[in-house]
Amino acid sequence: MFAGPNGSGKSVLKSYLPESLLGVYLNPDEMEAGIKKSGYADIHRFGIQTTQEEILSAFTGSKFLQEKGFFDAARSLSFEDGRLFFTSDVGNSYFASVLVDFIRGKLLKVRQTFTFETVMSHPGKVALLQQAQQAGYRNYLYYVATDDPEICGKPSRVERARCAIRKNHLTLLQISRATH
């Protein structure tokens, strides 16, 4: 897991490591950009199998999307030939986040090595580390940060409150327990 504030350099760190160590790499920002460019996400490229019912229900049943007011939009998704298709108004960061969560869950089930980026804004990330540890994974958490928030690469995203993180949402003790 590469964790840290937006713009701290998590994606840059990836470029310095061999792909063989990373396994399947999941970055919600890259996922969102790919969806916006093509209108779909190719699920097969992540080495997982799913059904139309399974993947679509991950979105229509997402409490996160429901809380954000995207329940109806989630019902507009379609899945065919391993591709999840998005309408133009749906390919946003919330949907990319749900898709990354879905893929992570599938990778855990088949015990495939994977790496992902996160801002660690939700206790569910600690639960994910605990679940992975119980499944026999060896967890590695790399926290990437800068000395000065003024030099972060993408401060405008935080300013727009797309990924605002509340203070003390996760404690270092919670993270430590999940990684040891």
Residue ranges with predicted function:
Residues 4-5:
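P-loop (Walker A) phosphate-binding loop of NTP-binding proteins
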Residues 8-9:
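Conserved glycine(s) of the Walker
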Residues 12-13:
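Hydrophobic positions on the alpha1 helix immediately C-terminal to the Walker A/P-loop
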Residues 17-109:
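Conserved substrate/cofactor phosphate-moiety recognition/catalytic segment
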Residues 21-23, 111, 135-140:
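Short glycine-/polar-rich loops that comprise or flank the Walker A/P-loop
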Residues 116-126, 146:
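Acidic, metal-coordinating catalytic cores used for nucleic-acid/nucleotide bond scission
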Residues 133-179:
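A glycine- and Lys/Arg-enriched "phosphate-lid" helix/loop adjacent to the NTP-binding pocket
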